[in-house]
Design a protein with these regions (language model features):
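Conserved short alpha-helical segments that host acidic/polar catalytic motifs at enzyme active sites
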Residues: 1-200
Length: 200
């Protein structure tokens, strides 16, 4: 499993992002990560298998300033990733289980000559695979739509650009996303537990 949290605010979002992601901690035990966007993208990823998310990121999150951000707790892949594409730079986090990950990556390598650089335990990072599929689209939205046409299994995506935050889930919603709002600040999460505690 994995847990996602994203936020778009008129002011600095780092504290909301930190606590919102921490409230997803029961969704994964291996990796935690945060990415924010102000003028540039900044990210931090830590192994949380031997320490809680909160203790690993408590000092880091204060330096991640921006009005938009995404966070992830993952059982399988270090995330979020920051990717350069023809749409510009974006950060991406993925939750779910893409059951055709290996065959899809092999097909992309054959068709387009893609090289995958994020390998964990001899498997391609799902976030990198999804990022490459999105980058093949005519736009960010069409790229996200193509992900759901090509994958089997389940997948939810948070994609952060300099312009905003995209949130998407597969048609069946096996890995759901929920949206909350308070005072003009928007959040999206895998589960609502963060919303009650953060006032959404």
């Amino acid at each position: 499993l994995s847990g996602l949290f994203g936020v778009v605010s008129k002011t600095d979002c780092n504290e909301l992002l930190f606590y919102g992601t921490d409230y997803q901690s029961h969704m994964g035990t291996q990796f935690g990560g945060l990415a924010v966007c102000a003028d540039v993208f900044k990210k931090k990823i830590h192994d949380i298998s031997r320490a809680q998310f909160k203790s690993r990121f408590y000092e880091d999150y204060k330096g991640l300033r921006g009005t938009r951000g995404i966070g992830v707790i993952s059982d399988s892949d270090p995330q979020p990733l920051v990717v350069s594409s023809r749409f510009g730079t974006f950060a991406i986090a993925v939750a779910g289980l893409i059951t055709n990950r290996d065959s899809l990556a092999e097909r992309l390598s054959r068709e387009s000559g893609f090289t995958f650089t994020e390998i964990v335990n001899d498997r391609i990072n799902q976030a990198e695979l999804v990022a490459k599929l999105i980058a093949r689209g005519e736009s960010v939205v069409s790229g996200i739509e193509s992900v759901f046409e090509r994958i089997t299994g389940s997948c939810s995506i948070l994609l952060l650009t300099k312009d905003g935050l995209y949130a998407a889930r597969d048609r069946l919603g096996y890995t759901p996303l929920v949206i909350g709002e308070k005072d003009g600040t928007w959040a999206v999460a895998s589960e609502t537990c963060a919303f009650h505690n953060l006032g959404f």
